[in-house]
């Protein structure tokens, strides 16, 4: 009686939800094919809340006994097929394979599988929801979705028809569906598979880790030790290729144990949805007040941000150029589910690697996908054998793909081997990496290759002290040019920004750094400056998250200035032997830098003031590589004065206004065919 009531409820739900009409349409497709199948597979979308409201018993079966619930729907669908004559070829109920796809699970702790908790409840054979980031995935292989068996005794009535049909159920291995020791229930003779009726489906395995685990990659020693492990997710049929390496997903599935060389916990996925991070509604009150006080200028707010940023690591007012570039790189990070390529890569030349390392590590942790590349692992994807014994090849993410939509901090550039640097240069130039899969090595007839987009910004630094010890520095004959002989010139060019923080640069104030170090030694956990109390790390995290969410558009003046500077700079840096020293990617960096400064200023329109900052930053980098041009930008052009009070901010604005006029003159002189309008025009 209870089963009959659940069947009635299932039919009512299918009718109300539109599932019955979809089922009829699917049946029509099977019937029109005029082909006889061993298994007819139907996917039914289920909203657990709606089912529970309709019938509590059926809802309970769907949530806690999904295999029994599937049999209820199987019976209902079989009756519907026979009553309405939907599929003429269908003979038995066992031929119908019902897959219940859940839209969601109740928001209760008992339905959540936390990969950091122990023990994991995986024996109940019911649905759980888990959330994680894909760190590895296999190539696609086939599995047996369903098979038809016949009694080997020709006299037996079951030697014909579709009485023995086996279908894959969640958690079952291939041998559970197809093997040679099945016996006939009528005469006990062995069953033989009718191979022409075998139905194959696609299968893929991905590995995920919980988001909490990212603390292990961020170099934050304050975090307490915790347990985590990767979890294998089996994707089948329509779910194959729905997950990408580096992306974060919410997964509904049934935990199972797979016994290979060792028992491994896996999940048979039922439904997957991309995880979307929540965007903060605004910024902190202190930043809001600062924005209001500096609203008369397009440059003051970002100058103050750079001035007070990371006061836990360096004294306010020091390393301002580097801090501004870091903030601009951070606001250009994006939700990893968006396909964007406006990253800002930064290479720092320094003689104080410890301080720069701390500063970059601190900044990286302000975004959710900040990865500090461990020396013992690979930056880019690698190939290995699949540990689940399915014959597929497993592709491991590497730090670059794990940092998708964020920052990949690879440390000292000189610590990497030559082949890795060449791979890095290729990835920076193409924003993609290709993985080669040799077929002979992994038991396949053909070689394969897979290409993955690189959607993170790379940060690195070069130790000038090690450079002077290993090589005799070359004396440059060009004004402003710096010796970067320790790293290949093409690799240095592939980084969008080259920042000089050596002792000779204005970005390396010695006395404030010494004072800060001494204060920090006395009070390691203390807030040494008022700025640390007024603008906390949480305030900066909120500011960056809000700035990243802004939708930007370019003003006509900004576009003209960007294109004008690019053409003029490209023309002036061209010689008859080597051609232009300015690559086509420089235009992309100019656009990205302009957008980043406008975003950091919390504006939705890129102005020519933002284009000026972009041009100055790129010109400083180009001068370090190739020497100065008639534009002649000073190394400290963005911060010519120490920002003590409002008067110094005003002087900086006047200086930048002069730089803007100088840039317009440079464009007019060296970039023929480019029009730059004054504010009056």
Swiss-Prot record:
Gene: Mcmdc2
Protein name, per record: Minichromosome maintenance domain-containing protein 2
Phosphoserine: residues carrying this PTM: 292
Keywords: DNA damage, DNA repair, Meiosis, Phosphoprotein
Reported phenotype of the disruption mutant: Mutant mice are viable and show no overt phenotype. However, both males and females are sterile. Males fail to produce spermatozoa, and formation of primordial follicles is disrupted in females.
InterPro entries in the record: MCM, MCM_lid, P-loop_NTPase
Molecular function GO terms recorded: ATP binding; DNA binding
PANTHER family the record matches: DNA REPLICATION LICENSING FACTOR MCM FAMILY MEMBER, MINICHROMOSOME MAINTENANCE DOMAIN-CONTAINING PROTEIN 2
Tissue: Predominantly expressed in the gonads and the brain. Not detected in the heart, lung, nor embryonic fibroblasts.
GO biological process: double-strand break repair involved in meiotic recombination; late meiotic recombination nodule assembly; meiotic recombination nodule assembly; oogenesis; spermatogenesis; synaptonemal complex assembly
Function: Plays an important role in meiotic recombination and associated DNA double-strand break repair.
Protein source organism: Mus musculus
Domain MCM, chain residue ranges per copy: 533-621
Domain of life: Eukaryota
A Pfam family reported for this protein in Swiss-Prot or TrEMBL: MCM_lid
């Amino acid at each position: 009686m209870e089963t009959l009531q659940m069947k009635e409820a299932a039919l009512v739900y299918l009718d109300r939800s539109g599932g019955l009409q979809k089922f009829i349409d699917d049946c029509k497709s099977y019937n029109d094919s005029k082909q006889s199948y061993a298994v007819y597979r139907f996917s039914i979308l289920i909203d657990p809340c709606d089912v529970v409201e309709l019938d509590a018993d059926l809802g309970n079966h769907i949530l806690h006994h999904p295999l029994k619930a599937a049999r209820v729907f199987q019976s209902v669908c079989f009756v519907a097929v026979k009553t309405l004559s939907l599929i003429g070829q269908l003979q038995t109920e066992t031929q119908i394979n019902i897959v219940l796809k859940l839209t969601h699970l109740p928001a209760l702790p008992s339905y959540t599988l936390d990969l950091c908790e122990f023990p994991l409840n995986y024996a109940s054979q019911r649905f759980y929801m888990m959330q994680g980031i894909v760190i590895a995935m296999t190539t696609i292989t086939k599995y047996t979705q369903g098979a038809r068996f016949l009694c080997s005794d020709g006299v037996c009535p079951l030697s014909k028809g579709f009485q023995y049909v086996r279908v894959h159920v969640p958690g079952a291995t291939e041998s559970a569906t197809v093997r040679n020791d099945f016996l006939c229930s009528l005469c006990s003779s062995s069953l033989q598979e009718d191979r022409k009726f075998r139905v194959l489906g696609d299968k893929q395995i991905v590995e995920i880790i919980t988001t909490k685990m990212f603390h292990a990659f961020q170099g934050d020693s304050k975090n307490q030790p915790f347990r985590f492990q990767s979890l294998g997710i089996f994707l089948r049929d329509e779910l194959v290729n729905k997950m990408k390496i580096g992306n974060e997903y919410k997964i509904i599935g049934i935990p199972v144990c797979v016994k290979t060389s060792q028992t491994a916990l896996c999940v048979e996925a039922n439904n997957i949805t991309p995880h979307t991070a929540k965007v903060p509604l605004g910024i902190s009150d202190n930043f809001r007040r600062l924005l209001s006080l500096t609203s008369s200028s397009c440059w003051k707010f970002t100058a103050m941000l750079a001035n007070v940023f990371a006061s836990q690591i360096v004294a306010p007012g020091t390393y301002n150029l580097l801090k501004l570039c870091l903030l601009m790189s951070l606001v250009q990070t994006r939700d990893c589910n968006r396909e964007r390529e406006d990253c800002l890569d930064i290479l720092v030349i320094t003689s104080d690697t410890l301080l720069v390392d701390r500063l970059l590590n601190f900044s990286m942790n302000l975004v959710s996908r900040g990865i500090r590349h461990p020396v013992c692992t690979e930056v880019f994807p690698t190939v290995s054998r699949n540990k689940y014994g399915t014959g597929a090849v497993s592709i491991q993410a590497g730090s670059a793909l794990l940092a998708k939509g964020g920052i990949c901090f690879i440390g000292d550039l000189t610590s990497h081997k030559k082949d890795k640097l060449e791979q890095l240069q290729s990835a920076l130039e193409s924003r993609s990496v290709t993985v080669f899969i040799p077929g002979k090595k992994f038991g396949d007839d053909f070689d394969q290759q897979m290409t993955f987009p690189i959607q993170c910004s790379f940060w690195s630094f070069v130790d000038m002290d090690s450079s002077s010890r290993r090589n005799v520095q070359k004396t440059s004959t060009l004004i402003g040019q710096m010796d970067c002989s320790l790293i290949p010139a093409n690799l240095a060019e592939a980084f969008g920004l080259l920042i000089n923080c050596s002792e000779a640069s204005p970005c390396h104030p010695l006395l404030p750094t010494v004072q800060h170090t001494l204060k920090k030694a006395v009070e390691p956990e203390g807030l040494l400056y008022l700025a640390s109390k007024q603008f906390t790390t949480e305030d900066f995290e909120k500011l960056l998250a809000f700035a990243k969410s802004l939708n930007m558009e370019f003003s006509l003046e900004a576009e003209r200035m960007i294109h004008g500077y690019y053409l003029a700079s490209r023309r002036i840096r061209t010689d008859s032997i080597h051609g232009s020293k300015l690559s086509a990617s420089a235009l992309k960096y100019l656009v990205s830098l302009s957008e980043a400064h406008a975003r950091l200023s919390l504006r939705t329109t890129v102005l020519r003031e933002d284009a000026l900052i972009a041009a100055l930053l790129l010109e400083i980098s180009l001068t370090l590589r190739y020497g100065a041009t008639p534009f002649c930008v000073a190394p400290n052009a963005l911060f010519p004065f120490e920002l003590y009070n409002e008067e110094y901010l005003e002087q900086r604005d006047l200086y930048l206004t002069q730089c803007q006029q100088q840039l317009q003159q440079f464009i007019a002189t060296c970039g023929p065919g480019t029009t730059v309008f004054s504010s009056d025009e």
